[in-house]
From Swiss-Prot:
Residues noted as binding heme b in the record, renumbered to the chain: H274
Organism for this UniProt entry: Mycobacterium ulcerans (strain Agy99)
Domain of life where this protein originates: Bacteria
SUBUNIT field: Homodimer or homotetramer.
Cofactor-binding details, from the entry: Binds 1 heme b (iron(II)-protoporphyrin IX) group per dimer.
Protein name stated in the entry: Catalase-peroxidase
Length: 743
């Protein structure tokens, strides 16, 4: 799952290369732990702490640190020159294969970026997570600790002007440049975090396990992007170590698709990445020591210390595979495909006992250079490399590239750029001089090409919206539908672009298409009237108007409740076209559930309260913000389908703290409904009369001790104004989540 069939790096070891990491290497062993934590005692409780993944107190740079501002001081050409120098300066403590660390750096970058998965946007290289557990100790990342240590002098020199997250990814891009490949571009802008996040990489309790993520014939559970716990993609020896290239192709196709790669991009990454470096399996993998997180303190974070020979250089063991893909492992060319199709292949084992293929009947013996000047070698390939020839779709693609290598060059350049940047969001977030033109997968939005509305225009537009006949609930739900598609994980979605009016979002069940169409029709009329009559070239986009209309409704609802609030509004959103919207790519943003609207897709089995926390996490809201948003949206009547679940008020449409007051009323007794699934009934404790209905999305604010503590604050008699102000602030945060231009 690591280098798998497609990493551009060959192996793991140390050198230039890189490949997967290795099923041959002993995996981390769970250690007995003590004492028991709350999570151990009550594993089914929701984890509210996940809403505060990176507290500012954890950063040594301080809450006011501005990475783009620091990066602006950086001499990027000097940085690149220094990285290039590191690549060709072999160190005795970890000698470079062929005198070049390029393959190793490619693998490092690939394995950082390649953890990205489309279903929830988690993973990727955007935060420098490879520095921390568990990624720094994954079996697939053997010896990448060496790659990062090689870069430490560069990081030390440039300090906070370059993040580790950027440097780790940039090094792989430099490696390609240094070996004669023309890259498509590069964008900086990844800001470091200072502690790991808890990410569900799988339910298995052993590394390299696969038993908990598959069902049926071989159906990989969502949201996982890898076939095996602790690997990036697939097992390079084949599924569960069975050396079957055709079966491996199935796993490759599935896992790369979950990283947003199609068949051609997948093949390009495997062929292109494996045109450099080598894998490492010089000897008995049992002689390799523990991973960094389990290594003795005196090793200072260095893991996988090997007692096989010198433990490095010609004796290196990383993946346990010993493969050199081409006769020119430090130079770009079409050698991978020329060898793949130029020989017949037979199944063999590496010196470490891992399955791989060797050119049949001794063909090509001595034609592959040894990394340290030893006798020439025979051509070798991974099981997953042979998949590029045996799978009919991959074969058709790679045979075309064999005849037209210039097409491979272009395909690899673009696929590599996508791999490194897929989790960074819109191109407006990219920094530096080498940013390529916007790509469809970046969800492009047009630049503002008109004068923006001013305060007077905003006031007039609010009045028109509120006089349009649309209700507070309709306006709030529409704005929420647009903005809440945002994911903090990969910076996708949000209101900017106005894609709520486009496929696929306008047809999502969660967005109530029929009602949405009615609201958008009215708002489009207001937009057209304004744009056709405004002076000075001023216009308002539908994206801006949707947000403005929702905010106007919030202000009205607060005023109706006796509270004056002002929701901040910053114009500048633009409207994307259907042509610049990849319907298939956007489909993964469709919510399975949205507890803020009390929506759940039919058939969803996960506990609603857990899905609510997950939704809040992706929106980037804190526990207090989640609490005030749910309570406010219930009061505003913004439930999906007009449901009354959780609407604990006799004046829906008015912004009040009634949700919390009535939820915490001990005069109400709750029980599961006999009439409806996932519904609870709140009855008067004395008379037994039904008062309210609710879902777990509502009741969790009374049952979970952390959330109840927050709910109590908003239920207090002195909290009415605070509640309205906090709701307005949290609302504005969600509306502006994708406004990176305001940061």
């Amino acid at each position: 799952m690591s280098s798998d069939s497609r990493p551009p790096q060959p192996d793991t070891s140390t050198q230039s290369n890189s490949e997967s990491e290795s099923p041959a290497i002993s995996s981390p062993t769970p250690q007995d732990h003590a004492p028991m934590t709350n999570r151990d005692w009550w594993p089914n409780q929701i984890d509210v702490s996940m809403l505060h993944p990176h507290p500012s107190q954890a950063s040594p740079l301080g809450a006011d640190f501005d990475y783009p501002k620091e990066f602006a001081k950086l001499d990027v050409d000097a940085l690149k020159a220094d990285v290039m120098s590191v690549m060709t300066t072999s160190q005795d403590w970890w000698p470079a294969d062929y005198g070049h660390y390029g393959g190793l750096f490619i693998r490092m970058s690939w394995h950082a970026a390649g953890t990205y998965r489309i279903q929830d946007g988690r993973g990727g290289g955007g935060q420098g997570m490879q520095r921390f557990a568990p990624l720094n100790s994954w079996p697939d990342n053997v010896s990448l600790d060496k790659a990062r240590r090689l870069l430490w002098p560069v990081k030390q020199k440039y300090g906070s002007e370059i993040s580790w997250a950027d440097l780790i990814i940039f090094a792989g891009n430099c490696a390609l440049d240094s070996m004669g490949f023309k890259t498509f571009g590069f964008g900086f802008g990844r800001e470091d975090v200072w502690q790991p996040e808890e990410v569900m990489w799988g339910e298995e309790d052993v590394w390299l396990g696969t038993d908990k993520r598959y069902s049926g014939k071989r159906d990989l559970a969502q949201p996982y992007g890898a076939t095996t716990m602790g690997l990036i993609y697939v097992n390079p020896e084949g599924p569960e170590g069975k050396p079957d290239p055709v079966a491996a192709a199935h796993d490759i196709r599935e896992t790369f698709a979950r990283m947003a790669m199609n068949d051609e991009e997948t093949a390009a990454l495997i062929v292109g990445g494996h045109s450099f470096g080598k894998t490492h399996g010089a000897g008995d993998a049992d002689l390799v020591g523990p991973e960094p997180e389990a290594a003795p303190i005196e090793q200072q974070g260095f893991g996988w210390k090997s007692s096989f020979g010198s433990g490095k250089g010609k004796d290196a063991i990383t993946s346990g595979l010993e493969v050199v893909w081409t006769p020119t492992p430090t130079q770009w060319g079409n050698g991978f495909l020329e060898l793949l199709y130029g020989y017949e292949w037979e199944l063999t084992k590496s010196p470490a006992g891992a399955w791989q293929f060797t050119a049949k009947d001794g063909a090509g013996a001595g034609t592959i250079p040894d990394p340290f000047g030893g006798p020439g070698r025979a051509p070798t390939m991974l099981v997953t490399d042979i998949s590029m020839r045996e799978d009919p779709i991959y074969r058709r693609i790679t045979q075309r590239w064999l005849e037209h290598p210039e097409e491979l060059t272009e395909a690899f350049a673009k696929a590599w750029y996508k791999l490194l940047h897929r989790d960074m969001g819109p191109v407006s977030r990219y920094l530096g001089p080498w940013v390529a033109e916007p790509q469809l997968w970046q969800d492009p939005v047009p630049d503002v090409d008109h004068e923006l509305v001013d305060a007077k225009d905003v006031a007039a537009l609010k009045s028109k919206v509120l006089a349009s006949g649309l209700t507070v609930a309709q306006l709030v739900k529409t704005a929420w539908s647009a903005a809440s598609s945002f994911r903090r994980t990969d910076k996708r979605g949000g209101a900017n672009g106005g894609r709520l009016r486009l496929e696929p979002q306008k047809s999502w069940e969660s967005n109530e298409p029929a009602d949405l169409d009615q609201v958008l029709s009215v708002l489009e009329g207001i937009q057209q009237d304004f744009n056709s009559s405004a002076a000075g070239g001023k216009k308002i986009s539908l994206a801006d108007l949707i947000v403005l209309a929702g905010s106007a409704a919030v202000e009205k609802a607060a005023k109706d409740g006796g509270h004056e609030v002002s929701v901040p509004f910053s114009p500048g959103r633009t409207d994307a076209s259907q042509e610049n919207t990849d319907v298939e790519s956007f489909a993964v943003l469709e919510p399975r559930a949205d507890g803020f609207r009390n929506y759940v897709r039919v058939g969803e089995k996960a506990p609603l309260e857990h899905l609510l926390i997950e939704r809040a996490y992706r929106l980037g809201v804190t526990a207090p913000e989640m609490t005030v948003l749910v309570g406010g949206l219930r009061a505003l009547g913004a439930n999906h389908g007009g449901s009354e679940h959780g609407v604990f008020t006799d004046k829906p449409g008015v912004l009040s703290n009634d949700f919390f007051v009535n939820l915490l009323d001990m005069g109400t007794e709750w029980k599961a409904s006999d009439a409806a699934e996932n519904v609870y009934e709140g009855c008067d404790r004395s008379s037994g009369q039904l008062k309210w209905t609710a879902t777990a999305n509502d009741l969790v604010f009374g049952s979970n001790s952390v959330l109840r503590a927050l709910a109590e604050v908003y239920a207090q008699s002195d909290a009415k104004q605070k509640f309205a102000e906090d709701f307005a602030a949290a609302w504005a945060k969600v509306m502006n989540n994708d406004r990176f231009d305001l940061e």
